[in-house]
Amino acid sequence: MIQQESRLRVADNSGAKELLVIRVLGGTKRKYAAIGDIVVCSVKSAQPGGMVKKGDVVKAVIVRTTKPLGRADGSYIRFDDNAAVIIKDDKNPVGTRIFGSVTRELRANNFMKIISLAPEVL
């Protein structure tokens, strides 16, 4: 469960290292984001020479959370960190590589490019 002021690791090579969630998209009453949801973030730390700079406001999709995600078959999956991938307005990632595993729930939200770039889909 990701909410406002949550800090996320960046799971791509866009140049950002850490994000701060400004807003969870999807309605005025929406408080929490889970895997596959889009959030508006501020870049809190970045690598020099990257595609995004510190202070930039970007959109990102959540790819990993420490909160267990329940599946239809009764199993749960959770990760060691909260991570996101910075995306453009057309849902394609800004970076060209994805680090770490992602879940197959991203396929239902049409993030096919992220799934194809990821080294492992759980």
Swiss-Prot record:
It comes from the Bacteria. PROSITE patterns: RIBOSOMAL_L14. One of its GO terms (molecular function) is large ribosomal subunit rRNA binding. PANTHER family: 50S/60S RIBOSOMAL PROTEIN L14/L23 (PTHR11761), LARGE RIBOSOMAL SUBUNIT PROTEIN UL14M (PTHR11761:SF3). Keywords: Ribonucleoprotein, Ribosomal protein, RNA-binding, rRNA-binding. Belongs to the universal ribosomal protein uL14 family. This is Large ribosomal subunit protein uL14. Binds to 23S rRNA. Forms part of two intersubunit bridges in the 70S ribosome. It comes from Finegoldia magna (strain ATCC 29328 / DSM 20472 / WAL 2508) (Peptostreptococcus magnus). SUPFAM superfamilies: Ribosomal protein L14. Pfam families: Ribosomal_L14. InterPro entries: Ribosomal_uL14, Ribosomal_uL14_bac-type, Ribosomal_uL14_CS, Ribosomal_uL14_sf. Disulfide bonds: none annotated. One of its GO terms (biological process) is translation. Part of the 50S ribosomal subunit. Forms a cluster with proteins L3 and L19. In the 70S ribosome, L14 and L19 interact and together make contacts with the 16S rRNA in bridges B5 and B8. GO terms for cellular component: cytosolic large ribosomal subunit.
